Regions:
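Class I Rossmann-like S-adenosyl-L-methionine
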Residues: 1-105
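Rossmann-like S-adenosyl-L-methionine
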Residues: 73-207
Length: 207
């Protein structure tokens, strides 16, 4: 165990009496000046403080229920059945989202292997809903990467139509293939492109 030196003990004593509200906001929120200034573009000083404080907390663990195979209610029950220190609750905004309180080894669960859910933050889930894709449409996801949002869009399309997943990284697209296989979606078509001017994109013009 580390034994405090006299100088360290005195510093801790002084630190414990500091009023955080009296500190410079850059120090209080552990932010560089440029980022603090950028947060100032949003209305209200309280909003800026909330944004800054949120960066000091670990990211939340959110799941998206794959509605081709299950629903949120069943996924909640499945996750809560894991027991231990974990608790599953609905995400506040995304209708198919489940928030996990804790860090379980999800890759080892039956639900993950069966493609019943994807690890996906609530914001990304909401983007798919904002797009509002319809059954039978043709949709292109540029910069699809490993395909998290692509798979969310594909599920909303109920595996109909054609959903192209474009990306300039073959490595990232390769990560989409096992995820697509687990999801059960047949309307997703990963396509490598070399740029936004790739001939593969131009062939879709007017369709």
């Amino acid at each position: 165990a580390h034994v405090l030196k006299p100088g360290e003990y005195e510093w801790l004593q002084r630190f414990s009496t500091v009023d955080p509200s009296a500190l410079n906001p850059l120090v209080r929120n552990n932010l560089p000046e440029w980022l603090w200034d950028a947060f100032g573009k949003y209305p209200g000083e309280e909003t800026r403080e909330e944004l800054a404080k949120s960066l000091m907390h670990p990211a939340l663990l959110d799941l998206r229920a794959n509605t081709m195979k299950t629903n949120r209610e069943d996924l909640l029950a499945q996750m809560n059945a894991l027991g231990g220190r974990y608790q599953a609750i609905p995400t506040p905004y995304a209708p198919d989202g489940v928030r996990i309180m804790g860090k379980p080894a999800l890759q080892n669960t039956v639900g993950f292997k069966a493609g019943m859910f994807e690890v996906q933050d609530e914001g990304s889930q909401l983007l798919a809903y904002l797009l509002a894709p319809k059954r039978g449409e043709m949709v292109v996801d540029f910069c699809a990467g490993a395909g998290g949002k692509t798979l969310a869009i594909g599920a909303l399309m109920r595996s109909t139509g054609r959903l192209y997943a474009f990306d300039t990284s073959e490595r990232r697209l390769a990560n989409l293939k096992p995820r697509q296989a687990r999801s059960g979606l047949s309307n997703v078509h990963p396509v490598w492109i070399d740029s936004e001017n790739d001939a593969k994109i131009k062939r879709l013009a007017g369709k």
